[in-house]
Amino acid sequence: IDQPSGPDVEMADNFQSATRSAAAGGNTTVLPFAMQEKGQSLRECVESYHKKANGNLFVDTSFHLIISDPSPQVLGQELPALARDGYTSFKVFMTYDDLVLNDEELLKVFEVAKNEKTLVMVHAEGYDAIRFLTKKLEDEGKLAPYYHGLSRPQIVEREATHRAISHAQIVDIPIVIVHVSGEEALSQIKWAKERGIKIFSETCPQYICLTEDDMKGLNMDFEGAKYVCSPPPRDLESQQAIWDGLIDGTFDIFSSDHC
């Protein structure tokens, strides 16, 4: 809701429309994301979102905190203080130029979460592998929406999921792996749960409604862009694996991930 966006991009929801919709659907509390930008104080980030929201809310509202710049001040002062103020869930990214955290940064955020008894959500895709594959596709002129999926195949998600789980083991905290797209990442979550590792997982409608074949023939326009998400839709086998994970309880959360 009301996230920073690029030129000519307008979010479908502002705080007024989103919380009104929530109320109409019977939801009395919402927690959208407050996204820290590089170089920004986390406290300043949270205050700016509250400023946008104030006077435009129809239900109770707080925020999940997206940590993109875990500076010593953020980790040592701001994040612990905000956790004690009641902001008890964070989100971190293992990809995207403006959001990615390296392994040491992930571990440090996890450590704060453990100390403050908060929960961390993880977007698990391998940044360097995606950059490598994207550069190859761009050099070959393969730019259509279909190739987005080829730039971040299942192995990239599988590797990052396993790495996130391993980091959580090192620090000994529970984490949530969000928007799981296919059977390879799902296999890592099952592996962890079978060993008693404290892992939760989420998937979304796009992974049971779409496959990579739906991306074929799309153009470089807004209609094509509507199908682009990360992680991308996978093959039919993965679609079935996601259905099975929902049915057998491997997934703890099923949500729209709508942005």
Locate each region found by the language model.
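Active-site mouth loops of central-metabolism enzymes
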Residues: 1-13, 34, 60-75, 94, ...
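Metal-associated gating/positioning segment near the N- to mid-region
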Residues: 1-56
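Alpha-helix-loop-beta-strand connector modules within alpha/beta enzyme cores
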Residues: 42-60, 64, 107-122
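Short phosphate-coordinating micro-motif centered on Lys-Gly-acidic
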Residues: 257
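Histidine/acidic residue-rich metal-binding segments in metalloenzymes
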Residues: 77-254
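Short, acidic/polar
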Residues: 11-19, 69-82, 163-164
